[in-house]
Amino acid sequence: MEQEKKNIYELLEEDIMNSDLSEADKAAKLSRLLQVRCKQVNIMLVGATGSGISSTINALFDMNVAKVGIGVDPETTTISNFVLDNLVIWDSPGLGDGVERDKRITRDIIAKLNEIGEDGKPIIDLVVVIMDCSSKDLGTTYNLINKVLVPCLGSEAGKRIILCLNQCDMGMKGNHWLKEENKPDEVLNQYLKKKAASVQARVKDGTGLDITPICYCAGYSEDGKEQCKPYNLTKLLHRIVQIIPREKRLALADKINTKKENWEHDDEEDDYGEETTKDFVDVVFDYIEVASEVGGKILGVPGKILGGVAGAVIGTITTIFKSIFG
């Protein structure tokens, strides 16, 4: 019988319990871990039909949560949520398939964005807005941003919205995409930068928010054959982790898609894998309490060490990400 996989909190609890700390110190650290464990992360993905909401969910996270469609018909008909322990993904139906349908979807989005949790804060931590990079008509999405998301999120809108341009391989109708290297050539790269700048300017003009979009490709297949591998998912994940409140980040740690090929290709403007790992390790330092500092690195991550437990705790975190990012 296959042993049930332990989540990140259970692994960290084991590390603390197996340490040589005093019982009082163990109790204190377990208490802080419990505080973190009680935090739930809610991420909503929105966009037009065909922008790739479901394929993005499946590419980022370790779950087969929705059928990924290649055709033009909507694949998701009602707003859905997928629960992975403390991580909840809200998959909003695609917009643009009828006025009445859009009104219903918009009402659902507004209701969810205005929902307040037991802590008195909004349920939704982050909204990922997905646009089709190959589309010239993004009016439906701009309307959603200007008239729904920003008014609902208020003063925190700039901190809780990520703008994404998916299917960047099709930005120039499939031209100038280096299939073997799975990245854009210089011509397409410059086009993508201009496209992102145009979207950024349009959103700023309509809302006053200055948000830099991320160009990426969630990857997709047709008739069982892979058409394009994921590209720049590392950058998107890094942005998500940065925006999620620090005390909630651990909810994502072991819920990331473990397919290494999903994380192999990006724009190389930064080492997103290493930076993401550091973001998670910071949570350990903040909430499991680290007592002393030493030089050097722990499994490649600079930082402080807490007797025997920090090495184990940090080891748990970095092992997860090194197996993914290499």
Task: Locate predicted features.
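Conserved GTPase G-domain substructure that encodes guanine base recognition and part of the catalytic core
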Residues: 1-88, 93, 98-282
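Membrane-inserting effector segments that mediate pore formation, membrane fusion
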Residues: 274-326
